[in-house]
């Protein structure tokens, strides 16, 4: 059993607590592929899990509904990422305040050149090529919001984070909206 805290921007804030009654990992998420006892390049496609809360969230100034994408995000868009992950690229250091930064949506070709792991059309590439602005260890599952729409979910990137020419990789939600809606419909 686990729970979520909704609307938290600082560790000392009083927020909404909700138990998670069920989780739904995407059925095609298979991060470790082995063939002939040899590890192949990791493929983190379909890196997505939905959580069903034991009771609905209260919509407030700090807890809002966000739109799912209805069209492809545009390369060059400025997007907001946030998370509670490490603030130190090389070590585990966690903040007392939710961290947010604006980054740019890049072509997937930039990430294909940067990584030996597979970058697929189920992913988005975002960051700053000069480095310094990135999600980091512990931020996975956080939002990538472009023009007020939830376009991606933080998936993976370089270690250490924030390296030049090593943008972050995000699950591309436009590819999963049918699955999301189906799971929500079947589990009201």
Swiss-Prot record:
**Entry annotated with the keyword Glycoprotein:** yes
Family named by the database record? Belongs to the peptidase S1 family. Kallikrein subfamily.
Annotated glycan sites: 10, 36
Q: Which GO terms describe its cellular component?
A: extracellular space; secretory granule
Reactions accelerated catalytically: Preferential cleavage of Arg-|-Xaa bonds in small molecule substrates. Highly selective action to release kallidin (lysyl-bradykinin) from kininogen involves hydrolysis of Met-|-Xaa or Leu-|-Xaa
Listed A to Z, the keywords are: Disulfide bond, Glycoprotein, Hydrolase, Protease, Serine protease
Please name the catalytic residues of this protein. 47 (charge relay system), 140 (charge relay system)
Please, which domain of life does this record's source organism belong to?
A: Eukaryota
Q: Which Gene3D superfamilies match?
A: Trypsin-like serine proteases
The protein's job, in short, is: Glandular kallikreins cleave Met-Lys and Arg-Ser bonds in kininogen to release Lys-bradykinin.
- The name under which this protein is listed is Glandular kallikrein-3, submandibular
GO molecular function term, any single one: serine-type endopeptidase activity
Q: Which residues form the Peptidase S1 domain?
A: 1-185
Q: Name one GO biological process term.
A: zymogen activation
Enzyme nomenclature, EC number: 3.4.21.35
Give each disulfide bond as a residue pair.
Answer: 79-146, 111-125, 136-161
